[in-house]
Amino acid sequence: MRLCVNKLSALALLRHVRVSGEYASAQVCGLPEPDPHPQHRWTARIIPHQLLGLSDPPSSSRPVYVAVPSKGARPLASFFKNTLYLSGLPEGSFLQLGESLAIPCPELLFVELATIMKPAALGLLGYELCGSFCRDPLNPRSGKVTHGLSPVTDVASIRSFIEETHRLTGTNAARRALLSIEDNAWSAMEATIALLLKKPVTEHGYGIRRIHLNERQDNPWELVRRGCANARVPDIVLDDCPVGFNYDGHGHLDLESVAAAAENKDELGRALASLRQKYVDDRRRDRELAAQGRIVMSVVSEDLFDHGGLDIVILEALMASERLGGPRAKDVLPDEVWAPEETRARQRLIWSLLPWEGGESLGPC
């Protein structure tokens, strides 16, 4: 079998091969013509549906998205949705994954999904492709997130790809989405906060464009020679303000390990020691960053779920920045950010982005 899947099918396959490590062996290829060989025709049973994000074999209501190089090459089974590419793509726009399946390169995939995804979901996808985390192929909304992976692209590469295309549907939406995306996100929740910071106020974000993620902050030698870390890496820093943010999720301090070890004295001691070590390192990190002139605010999941919770954290950070000699809070964010109808709309957007069933209104992610 030979098939180039695209759009949501390709996204699921890309997530699978990122987690498995198979993406490292992907090879640039041309756009192949679909071929069911050694079968004589396309049937649902020969499609590796779980690799393509489907829990059941494909059907007309659960299609496989396919890219083809000509009208005559279109597979006509009812469970396929075809995209025709005759021209307009740069060289190297497709990747071969093993013998049977190919996908669009990450840059083309991002543009394709701009035709399907809502802007906020597309923004989160951009953080995923340009970051070191990957969502679950079958359950991207609330499934397991894998961390510590290599990014498959970056913002500059996507922007360059868009500029090289000709009359490709989705480029305008993709170009707009890139304005709210940064490289090097380490987690999905960190990416959510960064997206909200950068999205324009007209799209219910905070409109803070100049931020960086996971950028090394070197400690002064006076601290290093006394045993402090060489550097610290806050999740998010604001370029124009002496503040930043760290997301501390439920797994940050592993309280569950303490509960699990409660009946075994030795295991409990080790779990408590590990928890204490993490807590102490966090406090030292905060002090060392403060010594560099940067206050880093912790963001917890409750701040995102509580109505107006993230608004409070952002306002606290800007008030601290102002007192540290940064710009006035009202010069960073316009008054309309805090209008009641705007805060309600922003909270609805935040809820739609979070990993819970209530966020499904955002559509595919």
How does the language model describe each region?
Residues 148-365:
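Surface segments flanking catalytic/ligand-binding clefts of nucleic-acid enzymes
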